[in-house]
Amino acid sequence: GNMRVVSLNENKEFILNPVGIEKFVTFSSWTLLMCLGYFLIAVINQTMMLLNINAISWLYSWQMVIFVAGISISFLTATVVRYIILPDEVKMGREHGHMFLFHEQIMHNFAAIFFAFEMLIVQPELQPNFAIFGLLFGILYISFAYQLAYFSSGYFVYSFLHPKPKIAPIFAVGLASSIALFYLGLWTITRFNNYNWLSWIIIIGWLSLIVQFRPTKSNHYNN
């Protein structure tokens, strides 16, 4: 669908319909890729185990790496959408019902829910130093966004990534660091797995604060 972007040269906002690889310029699309990638690899590994086929070690390694990055990115995405993007849309009086279409719900809400319950049910052995994977994926996304802007599309999907403002590098570093911080928060919750349902209560409470399934009404719409 259409999305608002910021041109590289003029630093002005305009609307376009991305095609091809440009569809993956949004952070939420990376959330979807992480979710699909993780569960695809998990199904492959589980099927091989059931069929008594020798495990492929690098597949198990990638499953863990993608899980760590995916759950961190999905929680960050849901938080940003609910507390930054949607309030801005309402403040500007924009119609934002498209943010609640099925594919958008998968990227903004259900990815975080799927990853969260996977963590609660499977209880993987997570380590605090795994936060580096989230940081690396953040750097990878930022590199992709700049590569696409300078050598292909000529635009950024997020204004804070535009190099013109002097504080742009701070926002870019902050994005990558936020992924790592979200992972550390989730890892901390896993320390309560042995305390009955405490980890479940905390995660479900956290999810309830970051997911949103219905548009926010504004005076603009009521008028």
Residue ranges and their predicted role:
Residues 25-26, 152-217:
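Membrane-interface transmembrane-helix boundary segments in multi-pass integral membrane proteins
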Residues 100-112, 169-174:
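Membrane-interface loop-to-helix entry segments
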Residues 111-126, 148-151, 181-190:
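Alpha-helical transmembrane segments in multipass membrane proteins, preferentially the mid-helix core
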Residues 53-73, 124-136:
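Interfacial segments of alpha-helical transmembrane regions
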